[in-house]
């Protein structure tokens, strides 16, 4: 890295540090899906909000009403149309239904072999069905396959009641979780996706939810690649046709109502890199399949995701004053990945802006500035710049010596 350009005076000031103009070439992302913390926050991925400007690569021509492509490792939105337009999710709603069931399983509030008594309400729910019988006892494992593989509304209501006592209470939990995940355009009324004027989302929110589901619950991802399921002697195929067309695709969920059109959230893993695509409002099953495959292929072929920094590779090494250590690494929480057009990773420009002088004591995780990453003059990502290790305060004489040195800096 280039040497730090110092603009500090003896009083606190701001210092903009230009890092190496050309980062070393970084191998394409290894299999390292971002890991959620105990709070459910995904570490190792930026919070997706708006896409970085990747317009150097023309977007594919799609017929969907709204669509999105997102890289799960970096958390970046690669491209989108109608990003924040409020749309009907139809059975894509069941992504959140399953998310909350997975959360209950992880917390021990449910077990896969636990049986659920099917209520009259669940049995009578209209639309696509698993064909469970009223008052029968069905395992959570079977109901999950009914929701994910068969898109059964009856199974969705049964699981909602198992988690929260009623579908209404479950919808409240869905909205609470949506708020935690930052789903700003989303409001749920039911667990199924049956039409309601207030049951709405956006392709951005569906992308964020899907990326969080894949990252937080990889142990349950196998349900989404299951091609068929038989219950009550009725075999039903998974409606996601991509599972038969592309063996890198391992999810996620279809949706359809007359008002929502044909919708599909899909995800594929190729060479350790995972992409999620969302298409809503297409004309038919073939169109949603074609649009999704086209979007996935375009995203993989035209972009790469590189790992820039982690705890062992700080973004910058900064001088510390009045501490037991003379220097400390500054970096990001978890690994930092960035998605860029193929062949452009060496042109990423990182700039660290942090408070100078840095005075001990410092604690690991203290925010001291911002790391900005840009390409061709356009900002792609901004991350908090954090202290990567504790720096205790020096003894009396060490502090006094540094105070004198600072007078001449």
Predicted features by range, described:
Residues 2-16:
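Bacterial N-terminal signal peptides that target proteins for export
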Residues 10, 20, 58-60, 80, ...:
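Sterically constrained small-residue positions within well-ordered secondary structures
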Residues 14-24:
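Bacterial N-terminal signal peptides
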Residues 21, 105-106, 116, 263, ...:
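Ubiquitous "structural anchor" signal
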Residues 25-29:
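Sec/Tat signal peptide C-region and signal peptidase I cleavage site
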Residues 30-217, 228-232:
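Active-site-adjacent loops and short helices of periplasmic peptidoglycan-processing enzymes
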Residues 183-187, 195-200, 204-409:
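Domain-terminus/edge residues, biased toward the C-terminal soluble/receptor-binding domains
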């Amino acid at each position: 890295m280039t040497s730090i350009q110092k603009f500090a005076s003896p009083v606190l000031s701001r210092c903009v540090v230009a890092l190496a103009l050309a980062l070393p070439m970084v191998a394409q992302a290894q299999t390292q899906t971002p890991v959620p913390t105990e709070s459910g926050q995904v570490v190792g991925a930026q919070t997706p909000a708006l896409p970085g400007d990747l317009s150097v690569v023309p977007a594919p021509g799609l017929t969907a009403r709204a669509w999105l492509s997102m890289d799960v490792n970096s958390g970046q939105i690669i491209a989108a149309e109608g990003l924040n337009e409020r749309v009907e999710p139809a059975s894509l709603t069941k992504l959140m239904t399953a998310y909350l069931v997975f959360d209950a399983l992880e917390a021990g509030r449910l077990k896969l072999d636990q049986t659920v008594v099917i209520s009259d309400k669940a049995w009578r729910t209209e639309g696509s069905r698993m064909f469970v019988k009223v008052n029968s006892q069905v395992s959570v494992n079977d109901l999950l396959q009914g929701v994910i593989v068969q898109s059964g509304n009856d199974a969705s209501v049964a699981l909602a009641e198992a988690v929260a006592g009623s579908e209404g209470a479950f919808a409240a939990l869905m909205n609470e979780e949506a708020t935690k995940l930052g789903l700003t355009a989303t409001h749920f009324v039911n667990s199924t996706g049956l039409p309601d004027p207030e049951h709405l989302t956006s392709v951005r929110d569906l992308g964020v939810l899907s990326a969080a589901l894949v990252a937080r619950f990889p142990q349950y991802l196998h349900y989404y690649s299951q091609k068929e399921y038989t219950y009550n002697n009725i075999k039903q195929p998974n409606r996601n046709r991509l599972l038969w067309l592309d063996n890198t695709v391992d999810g996620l969920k279809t949706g359809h109502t007359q008002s929502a059109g044909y919708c599909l959230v899909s995800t594929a893993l190729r060479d350790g890199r995972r992409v999620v695509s969302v298409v809503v409002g297409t004309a038919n099953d073939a169109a949603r399949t074609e649009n999704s495959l086209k979007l996935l292929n375009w995203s993989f072929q035209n972009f790469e995701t590189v790992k820039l920094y982690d705890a062992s590779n700080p973004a910058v090494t900064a001088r510390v004053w009045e501490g037991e250590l003379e220097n400390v690494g500054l970096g990001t929480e978890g690994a930092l990945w960035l998605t860029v057009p193929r062949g452009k990773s060496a042109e990423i420009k990182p700039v660290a802006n942090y408070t100078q002088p840095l005075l001990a004591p410092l604690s690991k995780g203290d925010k001291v500035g911002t790391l900005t990453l840009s390409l061709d003059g356009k900002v792609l990502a901004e991350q908090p710049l954090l202290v990567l290790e504790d720096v205790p305060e020096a003894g009396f004489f060490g502090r006094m010596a540094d105070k004198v040195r600072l007078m001449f800096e």
